[in-house]
Amino acid sequence: MINIEHVYFSYHGDREILKDVNLEIKDGESVGIIGANGVGKSTLLKLLVGIEYVNGGKIEVEHTNVCKKNLTQIRKQIGYVFQDSDAQLFMPTVLEDVEFAPLNFGYSKEDARKLAIGTLESLNIPHLRDKSIYHLSGGEKKLVSIATVLVMNPKTIIFDEPTVGLDPKNRKIFIDTLNTLNCTKIVASHDLDFILDTCTKCVLVSQGQIKAVDATRNILTNQQLLEENGLLLPLSIHR
């Protein structure tokens, strides 16, 4: 369970990026966060994992306040898949990247390796284990990025613009993978068709505030609501 209550945020005292944001995300939900550029979607994700901290209000993950003193506990429960996979993959090989988190959290080398291999197998990419990240396709990098997070078995995984740079084939593989993950998923994306395919609940953000929370199809078929907030209907709805 994630509770966001009366959250305000600004960078270095500048204009407010988020204003009185309230949201509850239940265990097991697949939640899409949508909105035009610069409305605060990515900022909200960063607040959830403690990359940034609220200026006012509070965020609780499993009844634990997201703050510096609780950061290790929070990051055991929430995984974050960056928009740019290259920012997340930095070890010489795929296997070393995936076992990095368990090692960092105190697992033995043997146990970390077992977890890493098992995670790669669960995503059907064990053949990539000894490859350099520089020899991976965009789709492969995205799957390995998921593996680096999934290896710790978090209750929640956050995805920031996950389809950026994916061709149609790898996009389909990624959608299929996402839909098999047995955890809470929070996805921020401009790809509204992707949100429609992967999320059952949708949150519309505009000018730093939540304008609507509803079933995904209810929001993404509401042309007036979308256009009022700088968005267009998903392509699949036009067909």
Model-predicted regions and their roles:
Residues 49:
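Helix-to-loop junction immediately C-terminal to a conserved catalytic motif
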Residues 57-65, 74:
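Conserved ABC transporter NBD signature motif
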Residues 110-128:
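Conserved ABC ATPase "signature" region
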Residues 132-136, 140:
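Conserved ABC ATPase signature
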Residues 189-190:
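H-loop/switch region of ABC-family ATPase nucleotide-binding domains
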Residues 195-197:
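A short, surface-exposed alpha-helical micro-motif characterized by mixed small hydrophobic
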Residues 209-232:
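Conserved beta-strand-loop-alpha-helix hinge in the C-terminal portion
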